[in-house]
């Protein structure tokens, strides 16, 4: 165990690399972070209701040729609970992790590739737009989608609220584990409503980004069911089509999967990340 700038770092060896586990105190919350691997730096941001433990397969594959930083958002995994689960609070978590990584002792000084899944993709876009020069490129996995229609419409809101309440109840069984999620059903619903608003204006954020962007999207985000699922899937594809019309330099890959693609298609995603363009040699500014 060692101390660096207020961070407590615990070392453990996991083949084929050493993983450093440390915490960052930010905004009254303790953020759990892990770092290991070799190659160009990469920060992997999980999504709502997912943890770095859930993303272990993808992170392990990426560590073969990247120096990978993973972490748990507030109220998730090994990070502490919080009184605020707004989009801005989660954005602050990602910003704190990135700032710590860039200033850490022994770092290369190179700007990292920023990879975000679901909510993590939206956070990555907002961070990149607000801090030009801080990253080498973006890989966005099934998120940050400028969908033409909101998902939380009055006709489906009761069903979605019931689904999130049930999800929060089931997640109670994971409390005390690296896969715990502490948000209530109402907090999950509130954040999803905020994400609808965020995505309605996210095209403006894309216009402010000057690094390469790659999208990895699911063909059936909401699954293969009828009715609402098909409507959501059409809206999802329409959002990406809208994005590439306005930002044709963005590369897009589609995987035959639902929104759980990071868990079911980790090898394919890792390969796409490896081939993602980035500003080689770019240093953080």
Task: Identify the meaning behind each predicted range.
Residues 116-120, 124:
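Gly/Ala-rich beta-loop-alpha elbow adjacent to hydrolase catalytic centers
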Residues 129, 138-171:
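Flexible "cap/lid" loop of the alpha/beta hydrolase fold
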Residues 72-76, 144, 257-258:
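Short beta-to-alpha linker loops that shape the active-site pocket of alpha/beta-hydrolase fold enzymes
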Residues 247-285:
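Catalytic active-site module of serine/aspartate enzymes centered on a nucleophile-bearing elbow/loop
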Residues 34, 60, 70-115, 157:
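Active-site loop/oxyanion-hole signature of alpha/beta-hydrolase fold enzymes
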Residues 2-30:
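N-terminal cap/lid segment of alpha/beta-hydrolase-fold proteins
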Residues 176-256, 262:
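Conserved serine/cysteine hydrolase catalytic core
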Residues 29-80, 130:
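Conserved HGGG/HGGXW glycine-rich cap/lid loop of the alpha/beta-hydrolase fold
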């Amino acid at each position: 165990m060692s101390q660096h700038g207020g961070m407590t770092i615990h070392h453990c060896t996991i083949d084929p690399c050493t993983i450093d586990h440390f915490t960052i105190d930010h905004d009254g919350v303790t953020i759990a972070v892990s770092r290991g691997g070799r190659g160009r730096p990469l920060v992997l941001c999980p999504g709502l209701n997912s943890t770095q433990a859930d993303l272990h397969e993808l992170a392990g594959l990426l560590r073969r040729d990247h120096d990978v930083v993973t972490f748990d958002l507030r109220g998730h995994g090994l990070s502490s609970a919080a009184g605020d689960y707004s989009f801005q609070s989660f954005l602050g978590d990602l910003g704190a992790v990135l700032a710590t990584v860039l200033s850490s002792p022994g770092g290369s000084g190179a700007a990292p590739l920023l990879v975000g899944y679901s909510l993590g993709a939206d956070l990555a876009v907002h961070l990149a737009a607000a801090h030009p020069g801080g990253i080498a490129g973006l890989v966005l996995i099934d998120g940050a989608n400028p969908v033409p229609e909101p998902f939380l419409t009055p006709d489906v809101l009761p069903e979605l609220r019931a689904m999130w309440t049930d999800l929060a109840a089931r997640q109670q069984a994971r409390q005390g584990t690296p896969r715990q999620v502490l948000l209530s059903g109402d907090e999950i619903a509130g954040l999803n409503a905020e994400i609808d608003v965020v995505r309605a204006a996210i095209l403006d954020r894309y216009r402010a980004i000057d690094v390469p962007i790659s999208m990895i999207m699911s063909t059936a985000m909401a699954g293969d069911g009828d009715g609402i699922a098909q409507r959501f899937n059409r809206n999802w594809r329409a959002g990406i089509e809208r994005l590439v019309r306005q930002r044709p330099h963005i590369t897009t890959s589609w995987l035959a999967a639902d929104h759980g693609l990071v868990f079911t298609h980790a090898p394919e995603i890792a390969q796409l990340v490896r081939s993602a363009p980035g500003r080689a040699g770019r240093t953080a500014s």
